[in-house]
Amino acid sequence: MNRSARTAETVSDVYLALMLSAFLLWTGPDGYTKILEAKYRLFLLLTIVYCAAAALSALRQIRTVCCCKLLRAVRPAEWLMLGYVLCSLLSTFLSPWRADAWLGLSRREGLLTLALYGVIFLLLGRLARPKKWLLDVFGAAMSLCCLLSLWQLAGGNPLGLYP
């Protein structure tokens, strides 16, 4: 594995670790009342930084590869994901609620989010490899979440989320 591939895999590992821990536990500065906005902003931040870092790494790897060879290397699942994003784009353009369809109103499930899901799928499918330590990170985050939930059920307010 060359240096660029290792860098891309490391960047993917960091992104996955943050999504499996910090993103799951993030409540934002305003408590539960604005948790959706806080999580969405964190999702955008982590994902855009990851995409930029992965793109820089990928550009170093594919500089010398012919475009035809790249197209032949696309897997069927990747074509399907690209088709899904393209259909979502077409649906957004043809929607009578086009202005709302870009971000997706209050739940933020619009074209931007769907396109980022597609990009994440494509990048992680190519750059990430399964690792046991990522399960440990996820397990630790979920254990902490469960402990906080039990504390709250017992009447505590450990994170100061309630007024």
Question: Where are these predicted regions, by residue range?
Answer:
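Membrane-interfacial helix-loop-helix modules of multi-pass inner-membrane proteins that assemble, modify
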Residues: 92-101, 144-163
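Mid-sequence acidic-hydrophobic segments that form the walls
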Residues: 114-121, 126-130, 150-153, 157
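Small-residue-rich segments of transmembrane alpha-helices in multi-pass membrane proteins
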Residues: 117, 141-146
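Transmembrane signal-anchor hairpin modules in multi-pass inner-membrane enzymes, especially those
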Residues: 1-96, 101-105, 119, 123-140
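Structural signature of hydrophobic alpha-helical transmembrane segments
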Residues: 44, 107-114
